[in-house]
Amino acid sequence: MKEPLKLTTRQGERIAVVAGLRTPFAKQATAFHGVPAVDLGKLVVSEMLARTDLDPKLIDQLVFGQVVQMPEAPNIAREIVLGTGMSVSTDAYSVSRACATSFQAVANVTESIMAGTVDIAIAGGADSSSVLPIGVSKKLARALVDLNKARNLQQRFNILRQLRVKDLLPVPPAVAEYSTGLSMGQTAEQMAKSHQISREAQDALAHRSHTLAAQAWADGKLSGEVFTAHVPPYKAPLERDNNIRESSDLASYAKLKPVFDRVHGSVTAANATPLTDGAAAVLLMREGRARELGLEPLGYIRSFAFSAIDVWQDMLMGPSYATPLALDRAGITLSDLTLIDMHEAFAAQTLANLKMFASKEFAQSKLGRDQAIGEVDMDKFNVLGGSLAFGHPFAATGARMITQTLHELRRRGGGLGLNTACAAGGLGVAMVLEVE
């Protein structure tokens, strides 16, 4: 094992997570229909500021992310600062790392606090699958630019006459990888076939996720980290995630047909995450500053690591590459963990990663390590359910996982928790959290 990499300031202070909060997560075109991501971000940051009773002027920086970019608000972070009553002098910038976006925001803030350039900061992310940047065809886009430069009516007519009806049709956001043309679902199908992940195993994991998430809500474990969202037209507030199957029945999962490979496939709408709207944020500061302000940290950032692999095969295997790096940097092994929370983009992807965690062959051939990462104890794994149940607003999921894990570690008397996720582009992230 390599020498641990301590995430502390020059004075030896750890990076504390003082608060974490999120909106309820809503399926596309339901409770948050018509609400853009920037407004969801404003909601969660405003509520966090109100709950912590922290003077906004003390916040040095806000780092926020959004995966589905809106052209009218390209720097979502700055718009949140300007729209929540925070000091206009608060620095703000946006990040994007696909499904690992809010992990990246937290990592950036952590490094800034370590460097001493920032004392207190907010990190998070928001996404809306209900308010999408519907574009135009490349031919129409070029014509519009040319029209703007045309000098007379004849030139405009010549430009317009080249257009066909099909060129006028709206173009929805791409769902496939730019570099490969493959969708996430197609990659999940490939991983299911390559690693012999059965349909029954995928459905069982989805059923487990929904059952545990429903129980977590019933037990009141999530109420402190999710606030009731009041959004226009203010007809009915959303108090909790609306994707969770409250009475999940395993037998019902088998009734759904595969989506991405209709003949031989196993990935269905029930064992994949739905398109989701939501926002989440965490408040970070050096631990000494938390003491000065009389704030009790939820926990600390022990380590993090990012990874990148090929996009043509096993693109969603990022957790299996990032996790050993994060564990090494934390100076621990998988068996030292109290909790493990892996982003469930698809049941197939999750199960394939769990299989690789336990594989010595994978460790030797892909990681250059003698031993496997380790077999995951399912009693520690996604104990409150995962993204299959909660949903997945791309940029918000990381902050949800961090907050959820820290609260659960506190309920268990402390310990170490691992958060890990795959992301588009063959990216992966792993973060080790610590609670005393």
UniProtKB/Swiss-Prot annotation:
**What catalytic reaction does the record list?**
an acyl-CoA + acetyl-CoA = a 3-oxoacyl-CoA + CoA
Instruction: Write down the NCBIfam families for this protein, in alphabetical order.
Output: AcCoA-C-Actrans, FadI, PRK08963.1
EC number(s) stated in the UniProt entry for this protein = 2.3.1.16
- Catalytic site: C99, H392, C422
Pfam families assigned to the protein according to its UniProt record, in alphabetical order = Thiolase_C, Thiolase_N
Which keywords fit this entry according to its UniProt record?
Answer: Acyltransferase, Cytoplasm, Fatty acid metabolism, Lipid degradation, Lipid metabolism, Transferase
Q: Where mainly found?
A: cytoplasm
Organism for this UniProt entry: Aeromonas hydrophila subsp. hydrophila (strain ATCC 7966 / DSM 30187 / BCRC 13018 / CCUG 14551 / JCM 1027 / KCTC 2358 / NCIMB 9240 / NCTC 8049)
Family (UniProt)? Belongs to the thiolase-like superfamily. Thiolase family.
**GO molecular function list:** acetyl-CoA C-acyltransferase activity
Its Gene Ontology cellular component terms are:
cytosol
Gene Ontology biological process terms, A to Z: fatty acid beta-oxidation
Task: State whether keyword Lipid metabolism applies.
Answer: yes
The name on file for this protein is 3-ketoacyl-CoA thiolase
| Compartments it resides in | Cytoplasm
Q: What does this protein do?
A: Catalyzes the final step of fatty acid oxidation in which acetyl-CoA is released and the CoA ester of a fatty acid two carbons shorter is formed.
* Known pathway: Lipid metabolism; fatty acid beta-oxidation
